[in-house]
Amino acid sequence: MCKLPFSKSRMRQLMEAYIRQKRASPGMVQASDLQISRPMSGMRSNSRELHAYDGPMQFISSPLNPDQILTNGSPVGGTVAMNSTRNHSNNMRTLSTISQEADLIEEISSHELEDEESSPVTVIEQQQTAPHSANSTHSQRPSTTRQPSFNDTLDEDDYTNRNIAGAAPVRPVGLASSPYKEAGLDGSSMETSNGAGGESEGDVIGNIDQFVMQPAPQGVLYKCRITRDRKGMDRGLFPIYYLHLERDYGKKIFLLGGRKRKKSKTSNYIVSCDPTDLSRSADGFCGKLRSNVFGTSFTVFDSGNKDSTDSPRLDLAVIIYDTNILGFKGPRNMTVILPGMTEDDQRVKISSADPKQTGILDLYKMKNMDNIVELHNKTPVWNDETQSYVLNFHGRVTQASVKNFQLVHDSDPEYIVMQFGRTSEDVFTMDYRYPLCAMQAFAIALSSFDGKIACE
């Protein structure tokens, strides 16, 4: 591959001359009222002047020639001889350059010049000397900054009994990311949590065992934190999860604790408001979470007895994860079915243990939506820069995980009923609002920790 003896700017000038000559030839049709401008092109125009050092040919006849060698205290004869030698060499260089221009026109016409510049050239104000302008061109070149990307952090249980290659982690996106605001992921409803829309942060009212079962009041957001304890002999496979309500100045209030039962054919979690006794027979027992064999469907029950007729066990929620047997890559798709709400903001009592009633899951399968509410996870947006799916958690989630999700209703996708995501290896944030209660939200979060054979 031959090396052209001209600078890139000179080659562009020759290419422009060739294009003008070709456009003037018959057979070319061009618009008479359309002026095509290429702001990203590196070609020069008559209305733009670049102040930059462009090689020795640009300053041959200029008194400010940066290549000129000046000597102090030299004899007059020696100076004249040096200038004569320099002028002779410059003239020879000019003659050889002019003789090659005609040959280069045909060579350039068969090759398309590639514009190596990716940003428009900025005109730099001319300084006292030309070399100083050249240095300013390099020092004042605009720099582009890249948004920091989060490393994909996966739990040990993400690799247990599942095909993790089929699941993609969801990353949190910063507040200043305008592409996601255009996509409708600005999460305007979560801005009200800071007090802008009149929504206040919730606090515990009354006893803990009653508070965790009470639906959140409208206009109140509860910010919680889940910690996972995997210390001990068997907590690597059966960790304990603790739910705390976040308060100001780093304070927190314990709400619920949950653990997975060891001797159970399917995943079965016990939830209690007593952190010292996480058993079904404990006084603080609040309910349980049970899954099917494949881990695709979870049902949340309260502390009632399924064999009792006076106070039968009630269905609090059903979580359904879409199956992914073929292994398509993408985030989790989940559907949450809740009991409907009455006019006084109380849950409709639905019991699958009562033979006279139909459970939440059966109502959903029958498409009987009169007394149930259907929620879905908010669809993340694919980011080409980070090659990942992203959601706007407004600073509440800081690490990527397949567990990160937001629950919304189809009628109002900007009203985030619940969001859950990771902040460190064993710490997760969980925020919920009306119509969820702490027990329902905590059970939904526990279902995301459980291994799912057919979902990923």
Curated annotation (Swiss-Prot):
Subcellular location: Cytoplasm; Nucleus; Cell projection, Cilium membrane; Cell projection, Rhabdomere
Regions that span the bilayer: none
Main location class: cytoplasm
Compositionally biased residues, Polar residues: 120-152
Keywords, in A-Z order: Cell membrane, Cell projection, Cytoplasm, Membrane, Nucleus, Phosphoprotein
Region (Disordered): 111-202
Keyword Nucleus: yes
Protein name stated in the entry: Protein king tubby
Organism, as annotated: Drosophila pseudoobscura pseudoobscura (Fruit fly)
Protein's gene: king-tubby
